[in-house]
Amino acid sequence: MKMFKSLSQLPRIVSPFQKCYSTDLISLVGIPRVKITKGQNRYLLVNIHTHGFTKYGRVIVRGADVDNHLTVFDSILEELEPQGICAKILGGGRILNEADSKKMKIYGTSRTFGSADHTRTRNILHSWTTYKDFKITVKN
């Protein structure tokens, strides 16, 4: 009888390990942290996570040369929803990407989503190998 009681505890013990090593969570690693274009970009700072696992998220930067931040958000949803990944917008702004001179300027705010943490955005960009050598300035 004691053995059956012990076995009934097994799902509670195994469940946290299943969540940590789930293939859904590993799929977040396959999502590039940065996708921006050259020139003037409207960008969004986004926290992504697998549906139901908000604790195990990842912050990404997405930007494009578009008229408003909602267009950027729509493209993010088109990219992530088929994979079962949810997105929470942390804020937005603008990035001036001068790839030829290896300079970037992060500034401004999104009227729709509010202001992003530009310093955090800069740190994410610096961690990306493409923009590691760029001089990135932040203006609040």
UniProtKB/Swiss-Prot annotation:
What GO terms are given for molecular function? Answer: protein histidine phosphatase activity
Alphabetical GO CC annotations of the entry are:
cytosol
GO term, biological process aspect, one: cell differentiation
Could you confirm whether the keyword Transcription appears in this record? no
Q: Extract the Gene3D superfamilies matched here.
A: Janus/Ocnus
What is the species of this protein? Drosophila yakuba
| Keywords, in A-Z order | Differentiation, Sexual differentiation
| Family per record | Belongs to the janus family.
For the ligand (substrate), the binding residues are 42, 110-112
| Name of the protein this chain belongs to | Sex-regulated protein janus-B
* Active-site residue list: 69 (proton acceptor)
